Curated annotation (Swiss-Prot):
It comes from Mus musculus. GO terms for cellular component: cell surface; plasma membrane; postsynaptic membrane; serotonin-activated cation-selective channel complex. It comes from the Eukaryota. One of its GO terms (molecular function) is serotonin-gated monoatomic cation channel activity. The chain crosses the membrane at residues 239-259, 265-282, 293-313, 411-431. The keyword Lipid metabolism does not apply. The HA-stretch region of HTR3B seems to confer increased conductance to HTR3A/HTR3B heteromers compared to that of HTR3A homomers. Belongs to the ligand-gated ion channel (TC 1.A.9) family. 5-hydroxytryptamine receptor (TC 1.A.9.2) subfamily. HTR3B sub-subfamily. The lineage of its organism: Eukaryota, Metazoa, Chordata, Craniata, Vertebrata. Forms homopentameric as well as heteropentameric serotonin-activated cation-selective channel complexes with HTR3A. The homomeric complex is not functional. Heteropentameric complexes display properties which resemble that of neuronal serotonin-activated channels in vivo. It catalyses: Na(+)(in) = Na(+)(out); K(+)(in) = K(+)(out); Ca(2+)(in) = Ca(2+)(out). This is 5-hydroxytryptamine receptor 3B. The gene is Htr3b. Residues 377-409 are annotated as: HA-stretch.
Length: 437
């Protein structure tokens, strides 16, 4: 009886052990062992060494992270895809439970040595250790990359500038006889693909054009694929914070020309406008990109605006100086006329007064007392009349001089307005021209 129960227990254990699947016997494990057991990642995966391995590339721009104008660097986030065929990693799916695709560690496989020529910093990408391999041996390696690349950034048309930065992919060691490059998608699809781009940033993606060419060098001919990333700056924030305040200050300065040229408050007003513009320019200096190659047009715009404000203030000071000198020279004339002896002598001769060298008798001196009072009164009246007449002449000259100053002020205002208009048209034309290039 004991022997019977022992045999039954052994049979049950055997059945259970046979029914439990072993991990090493699964189709996926058997396929992985078969593919990697005798695989050598140091060797390019072709049976015929004379055939080149074609690597198909694709690029999708996700965002523009930073544009460093001073150091001429562009930082972008891209989705990079490369596909190639490994002839040593193909299998018959019917022998492995119809497995069409598996994931394998990239470190265990041969991978093309594709680099970006414009790299100026360490490539930053998440650690994705696996790639997909299908039954025909096609390997798909997809990963996001943060690319910090060198780019010739032109800020002449800031903030309406358009930048064209290239990302050139090629093998660092293998020539075109060993590794060739191709496009994973149609070029038109690559150029117009903007679905993944973040439009809420400072930059707008215009296009991603792509070209294929062979670079010839002393080490051999290398296949290259170049993606030209064309981006345009969104100018609204800079127009609101930089251009519109400057335009308002210039319009306020133009309004000051309607003040009378002899008004001293006009100079105070223009001085306050100039000081305010200087403070505004200093506070907004960090908003304008600095480039050693060229000066942005907006920098020229600020400089010319400040020069025009200084010119406007200088013109008003010059007009006030002319008017003051005319008044100062006119105020001295009545004093000279009152202090002179010619009018007194003429008055005495006109009234029949005797000269100082003629002696009169006592009888005449007695009867001359009322006559002397009348003559003194007439002399004072004549002096006042001459003084008023002189003042009227001076006032008339001041009025005439002020009229001349008004006309001169209008002439300078028209010249100033013409210069400002010509400068505005020229600047807008240059901005429009450079933004299209």
């Amino acid at each position: 009886m004991i022997l019977l129960w022992s045999c039954l227990l052994v049979a049950v254990v055997g059945i259970l052990g046979t029914a439990t699947p072993q991990p090493g016997n699964s189709s996926l494990h058997r396929l992985t062992r078969q593919l990697l057991q005798q695989y050598h990642k140091e060797v390019r995966p072709v049976y015929n060494w004379a055939e080149a391995t074609t690597v198909y590339l694709d690029l999708c721009v996700h965002a523009v992270l930073d544009v460093d104008v001073q150091n001429q660097k562009l930082k972008t986030s891209v989705w990079y895809r490369e596909v190639w065929n490994d002839e040593f990693l193909s299998w018959n799916s019917s022998l492995f439970d119809e497995i069409q695709e598996i994931s394998l560690p990239l470190s265990a496989l041969w991978a093309p040595d594709i680099i970006i020529n414009e790299f100026v910093d360490v490539e930053r990408s998440p650690d994705l250790p696996y790639v997909y391999v299908n039954s025909s041996g096609t390997i798909r390696n997809h990963k996001p990359i943060q690319v910090v690349s060198a780019c010739s950034l032109q800020t002449y048309a800031f903030p309406f500038d358009i930048q064209n930065c290239s990302l050139t992919f090629n093998s660092i060691l293998h020539t075109v006889e060993d590794i060739d490059l191709g496009f994973l998608r149609n070029r038109e699809d690559i150029e117009n693909d903007k679905r993944a781009f973040m439009n809420d940033s400072e930059w707008q993606l215009l296009s991603v054009s792509s070209t294929y060419h062979i670079r010839q060098s002393s080490a051999g001919d290398f296949a290259q694929i170049r993606f030209n990333v064309v981006i345009r700056r969104c100018p609204l924030a800079y127009v609101v914070s930089l251009l519109i305040p400057s335009i308002f200050l210039m319009l306020v300065d133009l309004g000051s020309f309607y003040l009378p040229p002899n008004c001293r408050a006009r100079i105070v007003f223009k001085t306050n406008v100039l000081v305010g513009y200087t403070v505004f320019r200093v506070n907004m200096s960090d908003e304008v990109p600095r480039s050693a190659g060229c000066t942005p047009l907006i920098g020229v715009f600020f400089t010319v605006c400040m020069a025009l404000l200084v010119l406007s203030l200088s013109k008003s000071i010059l007009l006030i100086k002319f008017l003051y000198e005319e008044r100062h020279s006119g105020q001295e004339r009545p004093l000279m006329c009152l202090q002179g002896d010619s009018d007194a002598e003429e008055s005495r001769l006109y009234l029949g007064a005797p000269r100082a060298d003629v002696t009169e008798s006592p009888v005449h001196q007695e009867h001359r007392v009322p006559s002397d009072t009348l003559k003194d009164f007439w002399f004072q009246f004549r002096s006042i009349n001459n003084s008023l007449r002189t003042r009227d002449q001076i006032h008339q000259k001041e009025v005439e001089w002020l009229a001349i100053l008004y006309r001169f002020d209008q002439l300078l205002f028209r010249i100033y307005l013409a210069v400002l208009g010509l400068y505005t048209v020229t600047l807008c034309s240059l901005w429009a021209l450079w933004s299209r290039m």
